[in-house]
C-alpha cells in the first residue's frame, strides 16, 4: 500500500530519527544530562520524587554491574555514586526507565531556563497540522520518558506542538521491539490496531508493531542508521512526512 492510499485513525510517531534528529538526542540532550546530573541531584537529593528514582535505580540489573567496575565497594549511596551510575547508563545508551525519568527532570530545567530547544524536522509541524485537520489523532511512543517527550514538543524550534498531540507512551507500556507493547498502546487508545499507523526509523520496532496488527512505515532521515537489504523488504520507506500529508481517516461505508 502506498502512502497516498493509506487510511488510519491514529498516527503513532517515534521521536529519535523520526520527528527529531538522532544527533539532537545524542549530541545535545544526552551530554546535557551528563553534565548536569550531579548538580541536579545535589540540589534535589532530599525531595521525595528524587528519593524514589534513586531507590528504583538501585533495583535495575545494571547497578550491580556498575558497582563491580568501581575500585572498591561503595560505603553509602550518595550523589557521587548515583551520578556516576547515571553517566554510565547514558554512555552505554541503556534504556532504563528510572534513568529516563531523571533525565526528563534535568532536561525540564534546561528547557525552562532556555538552554534547550527541542529539534523537530521542518516537515513535522505541517504534517501534524494536516493530520489533525483530517481528523486523525497523533500519539507519541518513545523510549524517552513521557515528561521528556512533552518537553521536546512543548519547547520545540517550531514552537509549542503539544496541542497537536493526544497521547504519549514510554517504556512503561513495554519495550519498543516487543509486540505486546503495541497491543498495550492500542488498548489504551481504545483503537483497532489496524487503524494505527506507526512511524519509526528502526526495522525491529516496525516489525513488532506489524505483528501486533498495526500499520508501520520506516523513515530514512539523514543521519539514521543504514538499513540492510533484508530490513528494507516488506516495509514502505519514506524520507520524511511529506508523502503522508494526505493521510485520511477511513470512510464509514454506511455513510458513504
Curated annotation (Swiss-Prot):
Q: What is its EC number?
A: 3.1.3.77
Q: Where does the signal sequence lie? A: none
Gene Ontology CC: cytoplasm; nucleus
Query: Cross-referenced CDD domains, in alphabetical order?
Result: HAD_EP
What's a Pfam family this protein contains?
A: Hydrolase
Q: Where in the cell is it found?
A: Cytoplasm; Nucleus
Cofactor binding note of this UniProt entry? Binds 1 Mg(2+) ion per subunit.
The entry marks the following residues as binding substrate, namely 142-143, 176
Q: Which pathway does it take part in?
A: Amino-acid biosynthesis; L-methionine biosynthesis via salvage pathway; L-methionine from S-methyl-5-thio-alpha-D-ribose 1-phosphate: step 3/6; Amino-acid biosynthesis; L-methionine biosynthesis via salvage pathway; L-methionine from S-methyl-5-thio-alpha-D-ribose 1-phosphate: step 4/6
Q: Which residues bind Mg(2+)?
A: 14, 16, 201
The top EC class is: hydrolase
UniProt entry keywords in alphabetical sequence: Amino-acid biosynthesis, Cytoplasm, Hydrolase, Magnesium, Metal-binding, Methionine biosynthesis, Nucleus
- Return the PANTHER family for the record: ENOLASE-PHOSPHATASE E1
Q: Which NCBIfam families match?
A: enolase-ppase, HAD-SF-IA-v1
Q: What is this protein called?
A: Enolase-phosphatase E1
Species name: Drosophila melanogaster (Fruit fly)
Amino acid at each position: 500500500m502506498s502512502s497516498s492510499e493509506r487510511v488510519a485513525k491514529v498516527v503513532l510517531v517515534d521521536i529519535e530519527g523520526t520527528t527529531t534528529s538522532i544527533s539532537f538526542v545524542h549530541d545535545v540532550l544526552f551530554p546535557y544530562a551528563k553534565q548536569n546530573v550531579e548538580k541536579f541531584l545535589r540540589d534535589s537529593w532530599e525531595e521525595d520524587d528524587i528519593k524514589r528514582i534513586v531507590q528504583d535505580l538501585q533495583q535495575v540489573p545494571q547497578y550491580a554491574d556498575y558497582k563491580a567496575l568501581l575500585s572498591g565497594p561503595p560505603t553509602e549511596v550518595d550523589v557521587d555514586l548515583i551520578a556516576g551510575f547515571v553517566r554510565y547508563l547514558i554512555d552505554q545508551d541503556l534504556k532504563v526507565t528510572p534513568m529516563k525519568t531523571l533525565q526528563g527532570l534535568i532536561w525540564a530545567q534546561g528547557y525552562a531556563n532556555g538552554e534547550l530547544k527541542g529539534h523537530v524536522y521542518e516537515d513535522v509541524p505541517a504534517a501534524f497540522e494536516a493530520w489533525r485537520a483530517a481528523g486523525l489523532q497523533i500519539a507519541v511512543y518513545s523510549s524517552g520518558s513521557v515528561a521528556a517527550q512533552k518537553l521536546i514538543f512543548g519547547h520545540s524550534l517550531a514552537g509549542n506542538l503539544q496541542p497537536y498531540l493526544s497521547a504519549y507512551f514510554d517504556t512503561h507500556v513495554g519495550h519498543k521491539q516487543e509486540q505486546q507493547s503495541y497491543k498495550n498502546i492500542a488498548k489504551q487508545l481504545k483503537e483497532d490496531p489496524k487503524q494505527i499507523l506507526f512511524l519509526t526509523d528502526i526495522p525491529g520496532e516496525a516489525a513488532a508493531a506489524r505483528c501486533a496488527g498495526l500499520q508501520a512505515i520506516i523513515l530514512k532521515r539523514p543521519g539514521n542508521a543504514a538499513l540492510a537489504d533484508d530490513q528494507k523488504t516488506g516495509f514502505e520507506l519514506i524520507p520524511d512526512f511529506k508523502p503522508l500529508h494526505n493521510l485520511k481517516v477511513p470512510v464509514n461505508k454506511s455513510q458513504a
